[in-house]
């Protein structure tokens, strides 16, 4: 995934994870929590680091639903890669990512963290400049370059079960 110095790919990764698991209308939330009601929560985040990124997908569900949840996640990730993504889905994700960046800059700590990182790595840019990359991401580009990297065969799975679980 995206390295910190590749803001275009960072924004694309943020768009992809938002499309999949941010808000009630995102694909995974809609299917697993709203339609099937087999998860309590589902979240997908990208953590950007200097040499690359880590995408974490977390689903909280009853233990007896784990296999079904895993199967539906796999199905939805594959579907996102090959089925048409509607323009309104992409626009919604672009709005959420853009608003998230804008609102994060309201906190002085966030501004200091961004400015400090930029200064440390010698990559100064305007705080809102990552927004310019959002519009360069099309459905086709997401499906060709990022969504293949979010497939189950590219991932590791960790199950955290209660101690008294069998």
Outline where the language-model segments fall.
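Short beta-strand-to-loop capping motifs
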Residues: 1-2, 59-61, 161
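His/Glu-based metal-binding/catalytic segments typifying zinc-dependent metallopeptidases
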Residues: 1-25, 118
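Buried hydrophobic packing residues in well-ordered domains
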Residues: 14-16, 32, 57, 73, ...
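Glycine-rich, charged/polar anion/phosphate-binding loops
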Residues: 2, 40-46, 141-144
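Short, conserved charged micro-motifs
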Residues: 7-9, 64-69, 166
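M16/insulysin-pitrilysin zinc metalloprotease superfamily fold
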Residues: 22-24, 35, 39, 43, ...
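C-terminal regions of mature proteins
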Residues: 93-166
């Amino acid at each position: 995934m995206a390295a910190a110095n590749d803001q275009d790919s960072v924004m694309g990764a943020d768009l992809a994870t938002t499309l999949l698991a941010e808000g009630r209308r995102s694909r995974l939330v809609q299917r697993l929590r709203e339609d099937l009601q087999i998860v309590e929560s589902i979240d997908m985040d990208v953590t950007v680091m200097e040499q690359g990124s880590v995408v974490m997908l977390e689903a909280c569900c009853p233990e007896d639903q784990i296999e079904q949840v895993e199967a539906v996640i796999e199905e939805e990730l594959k579907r996102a890669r090959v089925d048409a993504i509607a323009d309104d889905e992409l626009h919604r994700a672009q709005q959420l990512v853009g608003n998230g960046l804008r609102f994060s800059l309201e906190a002085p700590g966030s501004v200091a963290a961004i400015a400090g990182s930029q200064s440390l790595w010698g990559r100064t840019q305007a705080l809102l400049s990552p927004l310019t990359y959002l519009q360069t991401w099309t459905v086709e580009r997401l499906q060709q370059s990022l969504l293949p990297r979010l497939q189950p065969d590219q991932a590791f799975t960790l199950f955290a079960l209660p101690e008294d679980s069998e």
